[in-house]
């Protein structure tokens, strides 16, 4: 594992296994392409780079993985498979999009963003154990700039979790919002701990 990647200890593993062994429906939320530590550690194999070969940084200084690189697919697939094999019912991909802030002209993209994301999602889904639900977080309104489209969401994911700032009206007509759309809380209640159920 690359340096800078944090892992939990034995008590974390025990606590997690207690939850996974319960009757709770469990969701593993994975940061997909916005990943500073892995981008820093695996620049040539997985990182989104500018045309001059330097790591791409968005306006917030975050580094990104390049979905078109095999190393990125291998890394995310390994994480998702491990979570599914541990017993998680659902894999939720967060940051499943291209960055839209930062110097876009510096990027050297190899192919159409939407095609790359669709190929990535389909390749990942094929590697997951049968019955594992694959979902995605909709952080921004779908656009050609970030590579996310309504068709991509409908064809590649079992559910779409919608962040407060995203426009869910961009989902395809006829999309079953009752079973395939989850509205995410924008903030934790002031009372402290909480559990979201449906």
Ranges and model annotations:
Residues 27-31, 35, 92-93, 113-149, ...:
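Aromatic-lined carbohydrate-recognition surfaces of secreted/lumenal glycan-active proteins
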Residues 14-33, 80:
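Substrate-binding cleft of carbohydrate-active enzyme catalytic domains
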Residues 12-17, 80-81, 117-125, 150, ...:
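Generic structural signal for well-ordered alpha-helices
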Residues 33-81:
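Active-site-adjacent "subsite" loops/lids of carbohydrate-active enzymes
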Residues 42, 89-115:
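Active-site-proximal loop/short-helix segments
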Residues 64-96, 150-153:
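An active-site-proximal structural segment forming one wall of the substrate-binding cleft
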Residues 172-198:
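C-terminal active-site rim and adjoining tail of enzyme catalytic domains
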Residues 1-10:
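Aromatic-lined carbohydrate-binding/catalytic grooves of carbohydrate-active enzymes
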């Amino acid at each position: 594992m690359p340096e800078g990647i944090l892992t939990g200890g034995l008590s974390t593993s025990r606590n997690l296994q207690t939850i996974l062994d319960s009757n709770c429906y469990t969701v593993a939320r994975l940061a997909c392409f916005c990943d500073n530590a892995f981008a820093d550690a695996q620049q040539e194999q997985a990182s989104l780079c500018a045309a001059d070969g330097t790591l791409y940084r968005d306006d917030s200084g975050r580094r990104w993985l390049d979905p078109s690189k095999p190393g990125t697919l291998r890394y995310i697939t390994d994480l998702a498979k491990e979570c599914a094999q541990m017993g998680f019912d659902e894999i939720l991909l967060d940051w499943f999009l291209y960055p839209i802030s930062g110097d876009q002209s510096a990027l050297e993209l190899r192919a159409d963003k939407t095609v790359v994301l669709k190929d990535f999602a389909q390749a990942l889904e094929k590697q997951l154990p049968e019955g594992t639900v694959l979902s995605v977080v909709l952080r921004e309104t779908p656009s050609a700039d970030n590579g996310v489209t309504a068709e991509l969401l409908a064809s590649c994911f079992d559910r779409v979790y919608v962040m407060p700032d995203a426009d869910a009206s961009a989902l395809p007509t006829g999309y079953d919002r009752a079973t395939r759309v989850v509205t995410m809380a924008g903030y934790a209640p002031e009372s402290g701990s909480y559990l979201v159920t449906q």
